[in-house]
Amino acid sequence: MKGCSFLRNGAKFQGKQKGVSSSTLEVHVTILHVNLAKSMLCGFIHVSYTSPNNTSLTTYFEAEIIGNRFTFETKWPEWGASEEIDNRHWKRLGALKSNGKDIPLRLIQPYDPLSRETVYMRWKELAMLDKTVDYQNHNQSFPFGISYEGFYYISFSQSTGKIKGYYYHHSEPEKVLFLELNPIIDRTFPVIEFQ
């Protein structure tokens, strides 16, 4: 699986984020930079909600690729995840199975993430890019009840480019938001003119 064409600089994905209620948000993700040597990538997440005023929110995120450098255990205490929460979310994504048995997170050995069909990641939104509304003012709510203070548990299929994930925020641990994205296939190629 080395050299996956979907996990690259400039890759784009689109899909939906669904909550426990009937609300569904349109989501577009652009990968800006992939650094496999450091097991990291970064990009933008653009969320939009079809409403009378077509509300949207764009954030910058950074990702930890699980494998050689980052483990399945969330190491950042301020993210509010515990081993139990990590287990629950990774199991939903099929990450902790071996020969049909569950494996404790602490027993999973470092591995080359690109040697497997599914790449697992944590995506953490770090900054909001939209300046139309002051969302940092605590008197105002985020559009359509979302926040960017939590993080995503992500599974990425190298063969199809499909992304699935679950959003977790420690202040709302029972709120389940499911993310599902498909790659945007760019069937164009650059035009070169020789003179």
Curated annotation (Swiss-Prot):
<dbReference type="GO" id="GO:0045721">
    <property type="term" value="P:negative regulation of gluconeogenesis"/>
</dbReference>
<dbReference type="Pfam" id="PF09783">
    <property type="entry name" value="Vac_ImportDeg"/>
</dbReference>
<keyword id="KW-0968">Cytoplasmic vesicle</keyword>
<keyword id="KW-0832">Ubl conjugation</keyword>
<keyword id="KW-0833">Ubl conjugation pathway</keyword>
<comment type="similarity">
    <text>Belongs to the GID4/VID24 family.</text>
</comment>
<protein>
    <recommendedName>
        <fullName>GID complex substrate-recognition subunit 4</fullName>
    </recommendedName>
</protein>
<dbReference type="GO" id="GO:0034657">
    <property type="term" value="C:GID complex"/>
</dbReference>
<dbReference type="InterPro" id="IPR018618">
    <property type="entry name" value="Vacuolar_import/degrad_Vid24"/>
</dbReference>
<dbReference type="GO" id="GO:0043161">
    <property type="term" value="P:proteasome-mediated ubiquitin-dependent protein catabolic process"/>
</dbReference>
<comment type="function">
    <text>Substrate-recognition component of the GID E3 ligase complex recruiting N termini and catalyzing ubiquitination of proteins targeted for degradation. GID E3 is regulated through assembly with interchangeable N-degron-binding substrate receptors induced by distinct environmental perturbations. Required for the adaptation to the presence of glucose in the growth medium; mediates the degradation of enzymes involved in gluconeogenesis when cells are shifted to glucose-containing medium. Specific for substrates with an N-terminal Pro (Pro/N-degron).</text>
</comment>
<comment type="subunit">
    <text>Substrate-recognition component of the GID/CTLH complex. In the absence of stress, the complex exists as an inactive anticipatory complex (GID(Ant)), composed of Gid1, the E3 ubiquitin-ligase Gid2, Gid5, Gid8, and the RING-like subunit Gid9, awaiting a substrate receptor to form the active E3 ligase complex. When cells are shifted to glucose-containing medium, the substrate receptor Gid4 is induced and becomes part of the complex, named GID(SR4). Additionally, Gid7 transforms the GID(SR4) E3 ligase core into a higher-order supramolecular assembly (Chelator-GID(SR4)).</text>
</comment>
<dbReference type="GO" id="GO:0030659">
    <property type="term" value="C:cytoplasmic vesicle membrane"/>
</dbReference>
<dbReference type="GO" id="GO:0007039">
    <property type="term" value="P:protein catabolic process in the vacuole"/>
</dbReference>
<keyword id="KW-0472">Membrane</keyword>
<dbReference type="GO" id="GO:0006623">
    <property type="term" value="P:protein targeting to vacuole"/>
</dbReference>
<dbReference type="GO" id="GO:0005773">
    <property type="term" value="C:vacuole"/>
</dbReference>
